[in-house]
Amino acid sequence: MRRPKKYEAGEATQYISRRAAIRKLQLSLNDFRRLCILKGVYPREPKHRRRAQKGSSEIKILYHTKDIRFLLHESIVWTLRDYKIFAKKTSRDRAIKDFRNLKRRLALFPEIKLDHIVKERYPTFIDALKDLDDCLTLLFLFSTFPSLHLIPREQSNLCRRLTIEFLHYVIASKSLRKVFISIKGYYFQAEIKGQKVTWIMPHYYPFKPQSRQEVDFKVMSIFVEFYTILQGFTNFRLFHGLNLAYPPQFPSSLLQDNEDTFKDEASFVSDRIAALNFELLRTDKVQEDEEEPDIDMELLEQDGDSKRIIKMKQEAQEVSRLRTLFKGLKFFINREVPREPLVILIRSFGGKVSWDASVFPGATFAENDETITHQIVDRPSLSTQYISRDYIQPQWLFDCVNQRQLLPTNDYFLGETLPPHLSPFVDSKRDSYIPPEEKALHDPSLIETHEQSEEESEEDEAEKEEEEADQELLDAQLQLAYQQETAEYKKYGGPDGVNEDEEDLSEEDDEEDDDEEDVDKEDVDEQTKRKQQEKEKMSVQSGKVHKVNKRQVHKAEVDEHRLQARMVKPRHRNLFRKLIREKQTKEKEEWLLRKKRRNIDADNKEAKKAAKREARKQAAEAAARAAKLVK
């Protein structure tokens, strides 16, 4: 038997460098990158890099050999090779100015078909929904881009169309569950076929060109090329699941014969679709106002009353209430407020919404409509206001959805300081720092309290001294009033302030009290004798207070931790150190957040005190002015 040579078996044969893979596939670097992105092949990190690189110690980009073999049988490879041939022939035709032949070749441009790759990477529809987060986030981002060198206008328009179609499905199915506003954009989470799909809709900012070193638009554009095909298949399946016509269409009642429709019906329909404010055409001709919940409540009632079943019942009831949260409410969006995120939010939960017709087409009612219940405003004041509606800031909608109930609007009025906007995507039972507002939201009894510092204790003592001084002043006033009253009583009564008849009655009462006191003394003597007899039988020893030495407890904890560190196996020591480091950083972050919160609370407390002092000062000045006027 021949002995195998070094690096002919094992880890050395499992990996291949990028240069060798390009040479094997006979592609350029850009084509190889494009092929890997479309097929979902990515670099791998070997366990022993030196063995995988056949003794070489330099850092190389490695791929699995089986992945490269998998790419060899892909039909796209031939299309990418055809691109090279096409480019050479078209450049030759341009050079010799053979425009007739050039026109014929441009008509035969080789196109890459990605349908089979989508089916290959996502065998089931649920697999496609699980991978929809990055797809939607990137499509929403590209839908806001202008026409660039590496991003054609057709691609941005396609991204815009696909995202609008998906939003129409979310509104029709009422599958939105969580929302959040951050500096990155608007976070949305929908529940589709039991899968949670989360995406980000960016804020509307002017486009700022980025350098190639920061953002590689070419690579991102390749991802978008694949994601548009995936999203198109997904939208088609989702629309047909709700019996909606695809591509989206409107009922004939909406397309009235007017000047706009006569000019250009296609642009009229596309504008109304982008408005997200109209119901779409259904194929079954039956429009259901409320979709049935995914959970069968009768089946849950037949099962036992286990904790899991009870939790599922409660969740199903909350979701059914959430789907009609804004039902019966009418909203009007001011022109300074972002329209699209709020329209998605309101219509997904059963509300009606409109805006100024000059901002975007598709407005259904004007601002002077008396049936409007809420107007969403993001400015300090308004010149004209209606009594019949509430003027609120946009955060009210997001907080209502996250808490699954209609919150009071007084904290969200114009000019009010908004309450903290809590994220619904964090775990309420996490080990890290939890703000007091979030604790109070889940359980009011768990509001955070912290130990008082020296400054806080001094402030509390000062407050107590002020209260004592006020109380002493009040007592002195009461004493003075009592003395005046007794003086008047002495003037009109007996010499000591008591009448003669009252003196006789008081003497009789004193005699009765003396008799009662003698009887009480006899009872007390008997009780003391009994207690002495009981004490003789029992023996009680004096106890000692056990004082806990915090320093010794801390030392014991440190010693125990060191013992645990010594008992860790050598191969697990790096992992143990990493875990300890992560724990320390978490504790430090939590401590910093608590300290920051204490400082904020102290500043707020000081501001309230200053406001109270100012109010007292103004009240005293007003009282002094009033006294002068009376004189």
Curated annotation (Swiss-Prot):
User: Can you give the residue ranges of the BRCT domain?
Assistant: 321-414
Entry keywords, A to Z: Coiled coil, Nucleus, Phosphoprotein, Ribosome biogenesis, rRNA processing
Query: From start to end residue, where is composition biased (Acidic residues)?
Result: 453-471, 498-525
Keyword flag Coiled coil: yes
Residue spans making up a coiled coil are 591-631
Compositional bias, Basic and acidic residues, is annotated for: 428-442, 526-538, 602-619
Q: Which GO terms describe its cellular component?
A: nucleolus; nucleoplasm; PeBoW complex; preribosome, large subunit precursor
- Which residues lie in Low complexity bias regions? 620-631
Primary location recorded for the protein, binned into one broad class: nucleus
User: Tell me, what is an example of a GO biological process annotation in this record?
Assistant: maturation of LSU-rRNA from tricistronic rRNA transcript (SSU-rRNA, 5.8S rRNA, LSU-rRNA)
**Which family does the similarity line name?**
Belongs to the pescadillo family.
HAMAP family linked to this entry: Pescadillo
What function does the entry list?
A: Required for maturation of ribosomal RNAs and formation of the large ribosomal subunit.
This protein is called what?
Pescadillo homolog
